[in-house]
Amino acid sequence: MLLSFFFPFSCDDFYWGSKSLSFSTIKEIYNDLFLNGRWLGNFVAIFISHNHLIKALVVSIVITLIIYLIDKHEKISLWIFIILILLMPVNRFTQVIIWGSGFSNYMISTLLFISVYYLIKKYYKKNNSKWYEKIGIFIVALLNSLVVENITVGTLMILFIYNLIYFIKNKKVNINLIIMFIGTIIGAVIMFIHPCYLNLIFGTTINDRYIPQSSSTLFSTIKNNLFDGIFVNLINENILLNGFILFVFSYLYLKGKLKNITGLISFYLLTVMTILGGLLKFNIYNMFVTDILYLINYFYLIYKLARFNKEIWEIILLIICVILPLVFIHPLGERLFFLPYVLVIILMFRVLSINEVVIKDYVWLKIFTLILYVLLLYVNIENYRCEVKRDNYIKNNLDKKIIEVNGYKYPKYVWFDKIDGEYFGRYYDLYHGYDEKIRYEIRNE
């Protein structure tokens, strides 16, 4: 909570913070909560953007719940998991944790999606349930469908598959899975009846996003998304996660669980090539071939270690279902790949678990986590100090039409750090109630 208190507000935070939670008219509800169909995400964004303390409290609770749920249901090394989250690509960390609006959509949706998944696992084996359980799983499924589009669509696919498999195996329906499916359908309808999605279907660009309308543009979008979006965010930029995957395969080889040294060596080489390609910006077509070979090698090693183990392949199903909708929408942001990032971590710990290999939470892991936390705390305290100084300086110079302010000390840890842009000025003034004609410029230091 201490760390999240010092997360600076971004332009979007000022926009949402200027909204009131006391909706007095249907029009206000439509314009604010129903702005883009993300009812729950928009509500949380408005709620946390009024105050640093409120934001810190909500961020802390949600992140703690995610870690608790995963630690409760999976055999993980808690401290390795936390390290992998803290050291995810900086842009992704900034977009899903520090940026209030990004947190409200992508961290909240991760919590809800993981909750839905564990509820599916629980109630797949339990057809009977009490009335309050039915209400609870319906609400969770409904809320999960009111945050992020690809997760809504992905959850629909997952629940359809689980309901179908259950029916084929048992020649009857599972009422709990049906209730969750209905809740997800209702949530999807509430989300996608928004005019912006209908406009997207008919070719209108909304917030720089579009759906291709012809076979040529569809092919171009799929190509760009695969080459320069999905594979880059899933493979090339996840340097630490790639290192963890290498460690898992190597550790299992040393334990005698993985016996294919050729497959392991080729995976080492392909991992190095994908990382170098991401760092040095290799030709995207060459990278596409490398990434495809990487994935083939990766799934080959997974198969060698797990064969057709249900626990492994259902996580792979989850990853595919939440990523598949992203193939057809352009552009893609790093924040969309936070949930797949978490699912891959879970997958690798499951590979260890089914091979009866446990990584202990050594003291040095705890010390390293503490050092990381202190460093991140320092970075965000410095940015918070810059924010406070900036706000006080602007408040004392409102008589000027052009105000020069300092930028953040660590701008990579602030989303949309464009103080001299129109976007910042408009919503900053709206948030504070200042004259919207004031212009802001970065001071040359």
What is the role of each PLM region?
Residues 38, 83-121, 148, 281-301, ...:
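Membrane-interface micro-motifs in multi-pass membrane enzymes
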Residues 74-82, 129-134, 173-180, 257-269, ...:
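Membrane-interfacial loop-to-transmembrane alpha-helix junctions, especially the N-terminal start
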